[in-house]
A protein has these predicted regions:
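HIT superfamily nucleotide-processing domains
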Residues: 1-140
């Protein structure tokens, strides 16, 4: 755990860009406050590692299972045509994956999703509304 890391420290650091949706076995799911892609989330590992190879096989499998659970919830709640998956970590050295719902003929369809955290930022009430929808879809 690194208390200078937004995902480890949680609180104010992660609140700048994310809103906690729920805890899963191997990760925490955050709604990305910038919602130019409705339903965009981040699945952050509970382990402070930079690379998938730093996780044990069991931890890696559990993390991927959380990603799949979250993707299923996105499809159920938002009905995207495609979910894009992105793992970068050049500047934030904590394993996390962006799940970005994409909709045919809408914003950035056919291209890479942007990382502009101020494009279409939701307030706390709007975040909770979307998070509640995701929580319900995750619970099944």
């Amino acid at each position: 755990m690194d208390m200078n890391c937004a995902y480890c420290a949680k609180g104010e650091l992660v609140a700048k860009f994310g809103y906690e949706v729920c805890e899963l076995p191997a990760s925490t799911v955050y709604l990305f406050k910038e919602q130019s892609h409705p339903g965009r989330v981040i699945v952050a590992s509970k382990h402070h590692v930079s690379e998938m190879i730093e996780l044990s096989q069991e931890e890696r499998s559990a993390f991927i299972e959380d990603v799949v659970t979250t993707a299923n919830a996105l499809h159920k709640a938002f009905h995207p045509d495609k979910v894009n998956y992105g793992m970068y970590g050049d500047t934030g050295h904590h394993l996390h994956m962006h799940l970005v719902p994409k909709y045919k003929d809408e914003f950035e369809w056919g291209g890479t999703f942007a990382m502009d955290p101020n494009l279409k930022k939701l307030d706390e009430a709007q975040c909770e509304e979307v998070a509640a929808k995701l929580r319900a879809a995750i619970k099944g």
